[in-house]
């Protein structure tokens, strides 16, 4: 890893700023002054110090966000606010990205990380990682519709969705809410599944991903780091 990236990720400023620190002779690698920010170092085997203090290097960041409506699940956009725009400069220096996406009008659990391997495992169709949604529907839903959602319905392109789990929370006129758990992530899948049974989604929130649930203490737009236990659960093979 390049020295400037290590120092920037460890909170010593931008790459331009750490270049000045190195030039000032304040950075040591195994007791010897660093000469160039382009120098490669191994934080696992080499000791790097700045002004005599050991650098506590951290490679990855894992953030659980309650994504708000109206914000894009993207790293950048020239016209609209993205989930990364909600982060602090200290967190943005890790260059996190959303692991998967939620529609602009969808709220709920979104993982932001720079761990590409974890993101790939969570998003790979072969891994069958379950994702549970709270789905508010325009009309009441029948038991037959629930059965169809669970066995699979045909959506755009003639694709039949994989088996899902559907549970009715409330089924009153004007207040129909179901919990829907799917193991794939086709474009607008939940909305398309509702449409396939003659209904319409009016509000959508992702409650969980894998074995990790959204922290109820997080208001829309708020986020926190994953706990060690939550990270362990995300890394575990899915049943």
From Swiss-Prot:
PANTHER family: PSEUDOURIDINE SYNTHASE (PTHR47683:SF4), PSEUDOURIDINE SYNTHASE FAMILY PROTEIN-RELATED (PTHR47683). Residues 1-65 form the S4 RNA-binding domain. Pfam families: PseudoU_synth_2, S4. The active site is at 103 (nucleophile). The keyword Isomerase applies. SMART domains: S4 (SM00363). It catalyses: a uridine in RNA = a pseudouridine in RNA. GO terms for biological process: enzyme-directed rRNA pseudouridine synthesis. InterPro entries: PsdUridine_s_RsuA/RluB/E/F_cat, PsdUridine_synth_cat_dom_sf, PsdUridine_synth_RsuA/RluA, PsdUridine_synth_RsuA/RluB/E/F, PsdUridine_synth_RsuA/RluB_CS, RsuA_PseudoU_synthase, S4_RNA-bd, S4_RNA-bd_sf. Its EC number is 5.4.99.-. Belongs to the pseudouridine synthase RsuA family. Keywords: Isomerase, RNA-binding. NCBIfam families: pseudouridine synthase. GO terms for molecular function: RNA binding; rRNA pseudouridine synthase activity. This is Uncharacterized RNA pseudouridine synthase YtzG.
